[in-house]
Amino acid sequence: MLKYIIPTIMLMPLTWLSKNSMIWVNSTAHSLLISFTSLLLMNQFGDNSLNFSLVFFSDSLSTPLLILTMWLLPLMLMASQHHLSKENLTRKKLFITMLISLQLFLIMTFTAMELILFYILFEATLVPTLIIITRWGNQTERLNAGLYFLFYTLAGSLPLLVALIYIQNTVGSLNFLMLQYWVQPVHNSWSNVFMWLACMMAFMVKMPLYGLHLWLPKAHVEAPIAGSMVLAAVLLKLGGYGMLRITLILNPMTDFMAYPFIMLSLWGMIMTSSICLRQTDLKSLIAYSSVSHMALVIVAILIQTPWSYMGATALMIAHGLTSSMLFCLANSNYERIHSRTMILARGLQTLLPLMATWWLLASLTNLALPPTINLIGELFVVMSTFSWSNITIILMGVNMVITALYSLYMLIMTQRGKYTYHINNISPSFTRENALMSLHILPLLLLTLNPKIILGPLY
């Protein structure tokens, strides 16, 4: 495990000792090397976990998320270059240090073996994200967004700490590998209802569950590009990862408690998809589409069948790459037109044909076109939900239609139509941006050929 943690820590002195001309080259190249070494984690067997030490372990659930985390740092650095070109050298270095520390915390969160360590690192990811949003965001509303983000996350996760201390006192251990064998069945009593809520609420706020999702569009819209990318791609997946890990302790209580949350998610999935159709702001649309995709994951995790677990993990990875790519595309529009309003960016296909190709690919993966892994994840979730209750197929079908509608609406609004007069003098697409998009879409296309490596521990 240290072969990922120590190089990540050494990125910080590398950044601070680099000259102004070399700072982006050094940090991006080194982080790309780290992300390529992370591919070695694919080399493990499906049914056992790699116990690195008494502190860290990884199994086939955390491995894809780990690789996604490490893959994202060079992409965030590539995407932020234009955004930071006006800043002075110290601020650039500070920004890169924030991204590196965020990656460090995330790697340790996904591999932590003790639940308390997991909780501490889960909270630690809040700090760099908050600094990135409130310091480098675009508008002054970023402070409001940061406050929402901070208080939703903190209020959600304080009960989790109390619940973990209670579990530590009753069971005697918070080790993931021990808990599988030591855990007592949780029967339904009032105290256990509150324990279940305390354990799940932190992750449901993070996912986010419909109704607790208000911080997400604000944070996404106000964050700089790197903040949006890491928030959509990895920080939302922390909620899903935590839920998959902690449902182990809460059986058979989940069978009784899951109903209202499944209903809320199925309803919220349709509602947020419909909200997407009425958005004028490009980033806000992508943020709401994230809520609707994550609602599927919540439903899948709460149903607790092997198929739904596989669907949830596949959908999390697919959505991480897709939404990150969409945010990059929205940012490349924003850098040229200086506005996130979709109406002001019409007809870009005639000016930037290669960018239009990336937009098409990203929109199609977002609406879960076969044979992408987005579709594989969604199909697994839909089938397992259908076998749980037949009536859900109506809601799922409506959701798929609306998802296709808003994805194509986003594509048509930005690419087609007669272009407005103020975009006659925009710059062409850079090699940096094309490399960035291809590094997002290549993993998606390659995973299409071999999706079993992201289907989680139950495959």
From Swiss-Prot:
Coiled-coil ranges per UniProt: none
Biological-process GO terms, alphabetical: electron transport coupled proton transport; mitochondrial electron transport, NADH to ubiquinone; mitochondrial respiratory chain complex I assembly
Listed transmembrane segments: 22-42, 60-80, 94-112, 116-138, 147-167, 196-216, 224-244, 256-276, 284-303, 308-330, 351-371, 393-413, 435-455
A molecular function GO annotation: NADH dehydrogenase (ubiquinone) activity
CC annotations in GO: mitochondrial inner membrane
Keywords, sorted A to Z: Electron transport, Membrane, Mitochondrion, Mitochondrion inner membrane, NAD, Respiratory chain, Translocase, Transmembrane, Transmembrane helix, Transport, Ubiquinone
Pfam families: Oxidored_q5_N, Proton_antipo_M
Keyword hit for Transferase: no
Listed InterPro entries: NADH4_N, NADH_Q_OxRdtase_chainM/4, NADH_UbQ_OxRdtase, ND/Mrp_TM
Catalytic reaction annotation: a ubiquinone + NADH + 5 H(+)(in) = a ubiquinol + NAD(+) + 4 H(+)(out)
Domain of life: Eukaryota
Location of this chain's protein in the cell: Mitochondrion inner membrane
Documented EC number(s): 7.1.1.2
Keyword Manganese: no
First-tier enzyme category under EC: translocase
Entry's family note: Belongs to the complex I subunit 4 family.
Subunit structure: Core subunit of respiratory chain NADH dehydrogenase (Complex I) which is composed of 45 different subunits.
Function: Core subunit of the mitochondrial membrane respiratory chain NADH dehydrogenase (Complex I) which catalyzes electron transfer from NADH through the respiratory chain, using ubiquinone as an electron acceptor. Essential for the catalytic activity and assembly of complex I.
Protein name in the entry: NADH-ubiquinone oxidoreductase chain 4
Source organism per UniProt: Bos indicus (Zebu)
Lineage: Eukaryota, Metazoa, Chordata, Craniata, Vertebrata
Gene from which this protein is expressed: MT-ND4
